[in-house]
C-alpha cells in the first residue's frame, strides 16, 4: 500500500464546492503523477476534501492512500483519510533576518562585584 504526497495551490481550476449533510465543503483534485514530455499517458487526478480553513490561493500538501472507484466508463481516484496541511510560504525571498533591535533597551553594561554573584 503506497502513500502518495502531492503539493498544489488551491485555485478555481482544481477546487470545487459540493453540498454535504454538514454543509458546503471544498474538494481539491490534484495530479497523482507528473506526465513525461512527449508521453501520451493520461494523468490521473486524485480528489480530497479540504478543511474549512483552506482558502483559494493557499498552497496545500495532500498525503494519503489513493483508492480507485469505477463510475460508469470512468475511474475516479480518491484519497482515503488524507492528511491535508497548509504550506506556509513567506513572501520574503531573503534568508532569515537577524533581529535589528536592541533586545535589552539600549542600556549600558552594569559592573557587578564577584562577591554579589550567587555562584
From Swiss-Prot:
**Organism (species):** Lactococcus phage SK1
Please report which protein family the annotation says this sequence is part of.
Answer: Belongs to the skunalikevirus SSB protein family.
Describe its assembly.
Homodimer; two homodimers can further weakly assemble into a homotetramer.
The role this protein plays is: Binds ssDNA with nanomolar affinity but no sequence specificity.
Q: What is this protein called?
A: SSB protein
* Molecular function per GO: DNA binding
Keyword vocabulary terms for this entry? DNA-binding, Early protein
What the entry lists under InterPro entries is as follows:
Lacto_phage_SSB_sf, Phage_SSB
Q: Which Pfam families match?
A: Phage_SSB
What are the boundaries of the region Disordered? 96-119
Amino acid at each position: 500500500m503506497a502513500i502518495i504526497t502531492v503539493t498544489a495551490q488551491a485555485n478555481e481550476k482544481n477546487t470545487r464546492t459540493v453540498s454535504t449533510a454538514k454543509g458546503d465543503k471544498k474538494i481539491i483534485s490534484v495530479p497523482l503523477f507528473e506526465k513525461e514530455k512527449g508521453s501520451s499517458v493520461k494523468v490521473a487526478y486524485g480528489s480530497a476534501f479540504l478543511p474549512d480553513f483552506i482558502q483559494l490561493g493557499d498552497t496545500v500538501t495532500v498525503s494519503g492512500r489513493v483508492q480507485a472507484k469505477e463510475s460508469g466508463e470512468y475511474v475516479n481516484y480518491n484519497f482515503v483519510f488524507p492528511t491535508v496541511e497548509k504550506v506556509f510560504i513567506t513572501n520574503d525571498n531573503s534568508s532569515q533576518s537577524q533581529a535589528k533591535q536592541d533586545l535589552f533597551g539600549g542600556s549600558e553594561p552594569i559592573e557587578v562585584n564577584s562577591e554579589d554573584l550567587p555562584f
